[in-house]
Structures are given as C-alpha cells and as structure tokens.
A protein has these predicted regions:
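A short core secondary-structure module
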Residues: 276-332
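Membrane-helix interface "capping/anchor" motifs
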Residues: 15-29
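A glycine-rich, basic-preceded beta-loop-alpha segment at the flavin cofactor/substrate interface
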Residues: 349-384, 401-418
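Amphipathic, small/basic residue-rich leader segments at the start of a protein or domain
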Residues: 10-14, 32-34, 44-46, 50, ...
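Feature marks short, highly hydrophobic, charge-poor N-terminal signal-anchor/signal peptide-like helices
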Residues: 1-8, 53-54
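Alpha-helix capping/hinge segments and adjacent helical runs
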Residues: 109, 456-495
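Extended amphipathic alpha-helical segments enriched in small hydrophobics
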Residues: 384-451
Length: 495
C-alpha cells in the first residue's frame, strides 16, 4: 500500500511541476523530499530503512538535479558539449541561408516560440479595415472583372488569358496595387490586396495569377523599395498602367530557392551600349518556369555577379544581383510557353548568352550590386503573406460553399449525403480549414498592413494555407464523386 501511495505522490508532484513549468531547483527539491519520504518509512509507519548502498543510489537523481540547477555548471557540463557535438553534425549555414534567416521582422511568432505567448499582443492587432477607395475598388472594378471571367473558355477553349481581360486589368490598375500613388499606382494596403486577390481567385486561378505576380515578388516592389530615382520615375508609372508587363526570373534548371547553386553568371566589364563605351555586365543565363515570362516586356533577372578586375571595389565574387532587362533587348530569348497542369496563365523559359547590359540596369544601381538575395528575402517576407494565402483561402471557401450545398441536395437511400457520417467527416474538415485559413489570412495581412515583415509567419502561411487547400480540394472531390472528374463548363470544382 505504501508503494502505491508513493507512486501516486510521485505522479502528482511531477504533473504539478510540469504544468507549472517549475524551474530545475523545484524539481530537485521535490525529488529530494519524495526520496526522503520513501526512505523514512513514514508512509507505512515502519522504521526508517538502513543506509545501505542502494539507499545511497536513490539520492543520485536529487544530486544530479541539484547540480544542474546551477546555470554555470549546467552550461559547462551539458549545454556546451552537446552544442559543440551538434554543430559538427549539422551543415554550415551558407551566406544565402544566413541572409534568409536575418530577413524580415519578428512579430507574434516570437511569442509562440517563447512557450508562453502573450495573447493580448495578438488581440491588439487591428481588424480588417479598408479605406473608402479600397472598398469601392473591391465592389467596383474587382466585381466587374469577376463578372467578365469565363473560366471554361480561359482554360479549355482558348488556353490563354483573353485580351479583353488583359486590357481591363491594365486599364484599371490591377497590376499596380502595391505601387505608391506617387508613382502612378493604387497604393493599396496589403489587407486590400489580399481581399482583392481572394475575390478574383474565387472565379479563376489563371486570372488571379496575372494580377498576383506583379503585386508580389516582382520588379515593381523591388524598384519601389530599392530602385534608383531614375528607375522609379521611368518604370513604376509604366508598370502601374500596364504599359510594361513584368516577370521575375529566379528559377533555373539547377536552382530554385537555393540561390547558392545558381549558374546564371554576370561579369563586370566595359562594353558598348548604343554606340557609347560604358561600364556594364556581360550576362549568360537560363531560366524556366517563369510566370508571365512569355507575355513580359520587362524581365527581372537574378544572377551571380563576378568582378575579376574589381571595377566596383567589392571584390571578385560580388554575389547575387538583380537587374532589369527589356524583353526586346538584343540577346534576350523568350521561349515557348510551358503548360503547367493545363493552366492558361503565361509561364515559360527565357535565356541569354553574352548579353551586355549597362551597370545602371542593376536594380538600385551599382551600389546595390551583390545585395540581390537580401532584397529578395526582404520582399518575400511580406509577399508570401499576401498572394498565395489569399488565393488558397478563397479556394477553400469556394470548396466549402459548393460542397456543402451539393451534399445537401444530393440524396442516397432517401437521405441527403450530408447526413451520412462518411461525408460529414470530410465536410467538417473543409469547414474547419475555411475558418482557420481565413482567420490566419486576415491576421497576417493586418500585420503586414501595419508595417511588419513577418518572415517566419509568411513562410508558414505560404505552406500551411496551400497545403490545407489541397486537402480541402481532395475532400470536396471525394464528396462530389464522379461529378468532380467530368470536366466541362458546369464543373465548378475545376474552375
């Protein structure tokens, strides 16, 4: 009986200490008291046991915890040796990885990883707030664009974006939502951009792509944040009005997000441009999977820059650099379109060999040479939180709307399938995903709207919202059965 009581005391004490997140010294005291209680014989009224060698061994946990309660001793005996061992096993952090880790800002994610989040900080983030102009754009041009879209025509009959859609998007400034009003753009908040993109995504994933890409990671945002005054005054108004259609070329045959393996190379040298000798870069590159590439008039290019003669004064290996190149510049080749899973948005390769460009075509000019990866990571910290999460959330909400309605009207054995447990379970998952995605989208967009660049949260949002959408689509197709796989203008799941 005494053994059972002692075990209950041990379990109760450990649970209490764990739930209270007690410090190490408290655990040492508890273990010491329990050991003393167990050896004293007080639980069963017997006399204390003799001090044999086994009784001394019982005090070892108390001694170990007591020693580990001293921070300096714990660090020298355990933390430092373990850290040194782990450091020899893990691969070294590359320069590009370090820049990615340092990019952006730390917000509520720090609270989450602290283990004791202050939920008041989360509640202090303001709710969805749109200006009158943003709300009017959402209710006006955005609604008109959605009404114009015939998704079956886009993805099946034409297999490309109709020109009237392109004209409407350009005319109404959809391509310049993030460009400031000072430079001819709409200057909308991230929250407004998220809602606008989500509404378009509910009608067509192809159409939202041509709006989303210029308003996420692309020349527009890079020029707005890092461009020279000349680049801002020349390109931003043209991008905002749709006179220039941009693409950004990062992915190649050997590299995607891993810029360290990039084989697109540029060498600083003097050359001739428009009959004049000037300092510039001779480029050779090969890119693929570039969205808007076949339609682009302005190519943003990421490459690794070398300066053998140190003409820029930054050493031989300058680093990842970003440049703006007109698509009709001599030597620039735009390849045939890819067909990514039957999608109709323009996507394709581009390449060039020994293409000379002036040094001032580098985004930000000569001084920003070698800073390209940091520039990309800073922009991605915000862009990842808006574009894909908004379209993924809209997709899930669309799945919920049509699937819940279908499950209510579709009957089997005299009952709506929505009342069958095998359908209820995936339907509940879709409902949960819709609420979770929308809450996360709205909260993250609000963070970005107030000036944060949450790199960790945005990366998690990009992955989690799209993955949850994929699962919701699977559940929706399972519930619809054969109706989901028979394509046609009435198949709302594939639109």
């Amino acid at each position: 009986m005494a053994t059972v009581v002692l075990l209950l005391l041990v379990v109760g004490a450990f649970l209490a200490l764990g739930m209270a997140r007690a410090p190490m010294w408290a655990w040492a005291v508890a273990v010491g008291l329990l050991t003393l209680l167990g050896q004293s014989g007080a639980l069963d009224g017997a006399e204390a046991a003799g001090h044999g060698i086994l009784s001394w061994f019982a005090w070892l946990p108390f001694v170990a915890l007591s020693l580990l309660s001293i921070p300096s001793l714990r660090r020298s005996l355990i933390v430092a040796p373990v850290f040194d061992k782990v450091r020899t096993i893990l691969p070294k952090v590359s320069d590009t990885e370090a820049q990615a880790l340092e990019a952006g800002t730390v917000g509520f994610d720090a609270e989450i990883f602290s283990g004791t989040p202050d939920w008041n900080k989360l509640q202090s983030i303001p709710p969805i707030q749109l200006s009158a102009e943003e709300q009017a754009f959402l209710d006006g041009p955005t609604h008109q664009l959605c009404a114009m879209i015939n998704d079956w025509q886009v993805r099946h009959s034409l297999r490309e974006i109709p020109e009237d859609i392109w004209d409407f998007v350009k005319k109404n400034g959809f391509l310049g939502m993030l460009i400031s009003k000072e430079h001819g753009g709409l200057g909308f908040s991230p929250q407004a951009q998220s809602l606008i993109l989500g509404k378009i995504a509910s009608r067509s994933p192809d159409i939202v792509t041509i709006v989303m890409v210029p308003n996420s990671l692309g020349p527009g945002e890079l020029i707005e944040k890092y461009g020279t005054d000349a680049q801002k005054h020349h390109y931003l108004p043209r991008l905002a009005k749709g006179e220039e259609v941009p693409c950004f070329s990062l992915t190649g045959p050997t590299s995607g997000s891993d810029a360290a393996t990039m084989r697109d190379i540029g060498y600083v040298m003097r050359g001739t441009y428009q009959g004049n000798e000037t300092l510039g870069v001779r480029l050779s590159w090969e890119k693929r999977y570039i969205t808007l590439g076949p339609k682009a008039t302005l190519v943003g290019l990421a490459f690794r820059l070398f300066d053998k003669d140190n003409l820029l004064g930054k050493g031989e290996d300058v680093g990842i650099t970003l440049a703006l190149i007109p698509a009709d510049h001599p030597g620039v080749n735009i390849g045939r379109r890819h067909l990514p899973s039957g999608a109709a948005f323009p996507n394709g390769p581009n390449w060039g060999s020994d293409v000379f460009i002036p040094i001032d075509w580098i985004i930000g000019g000569e001084k920003m040479a070698g800073n390209g990866w940091r520039m990309l990571m800073e922009c991605l910290s915000a862009g990842r939180a808006i574009s894909l999460p908004s379209s993924a959330t809209a997709g899930v909400k669309m799945m919920l709307r049509v699937t819940s309605a279908y499950a209510r009207v579709r009957k089997q054995f005299g009952l709506p399938v929505s009342r069958m447990e095998g359908v209820e379970e995936p339907l509940v998952r879709i409902i949960e995903t819709a609420y979770v995605n929308e809450a996360a989208r709205a909260m993250t967009a609000a963070m970005v709207s107030r000036g944060e660049r949450p790199s960790v949260i945005s990366a998690l949002m990009k992955y989690q919202t799209t993955e949850k959408m994929r699962r919701a689509v699977n559940d929706a197709m399972d519930i619809h059965g054969g109706r989901a796989i028979c394509d046609g203008p009435s198949n709302y799941l594939q639109s």
